[in-house]
Amino acid sequence: MQYALDHPALSLTLQAPVSPYGFGGTRRDGTRLTDDDAGTGAGGANADFVQRLTDGDMGDDSPTSPRSVFRSGYVAPGYTSEHEDLWVESMNTTSTATGNYPGDSVDSPNWPGFAPGRIGVLNTMAPRYFDTSGIVDLAQKPPILWVHGTVDAIVSDASFFDLNHLGAIGVIPGWPGEDVAPAQPMVSQTRDVLDAYRAAGGTVTEVVLESVGHSPHLERPALFRRALLEAIGYIGAPADPAPPTEAIILSSSD
């Protein structure tokens, strides 16, 4: 979405996307819960998971190992793949050096006691830095394909990666309540913005995949491939101008 705000685009495909209002810390209409975006950004990263990324951990002996996080967060329960080692190896290429993952945080007087800093991957999604709802006002609106699964643990109206939701269900103590720290309705926010995009003259195609988690392209590769090829004009109604045929390199398996 940010790319489409910064550059002309022929089409836009969103796969299990972050909300247009960032990750955590907003109400449904996108208003920020606190001035410092408490509870969002790098401070929410699990320190043991970060250390295991640094160590290149390939095991599954802990719920915070990259392999366990892949299974519990990135895909739906029961998903298996002969390529799992490759996906975990890819996770372990993440740089945990200062300035990359997860980033820095600062103390906050607001629950849960921290706010995003100024550097790092997770801070880029804090509401103070991330707001792509302006796509509604684009003069030239590329057609949008939105693909997401029904059991996404990461991007959800009840995300297990949203500290406010974790507070509400008792995982994190001291939660100040729904009025102060509600869970972010991520999918509903995306739908609201895309509905407004459609009402303003844009085209939006939504593909909802049952029993699919955060990785539709891995979990339902054939369905994802077909939806993408339809969106960019290779099958069905041709796009104008047509995309280059040399771009077709997508197999229908993972």
Predicted regions mapped to residue ranges:
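Conserved hydrolase catalytic core segment
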Residues: 1-31
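Surface-exposed intrinsically disordered loops and tails
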Residues: 13-15, 35-41, 203
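Short catalytic/ligand-binding loop motif for oxyanion handling, primarily in non-cytosolic enzymes
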Residues: 21-24, 78, 153-156, 214-217
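Catalytic active-site module of serine/aspartate enzymes centered on a nucleophile-bearing elbow/loop
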Residues: 162, 170-254
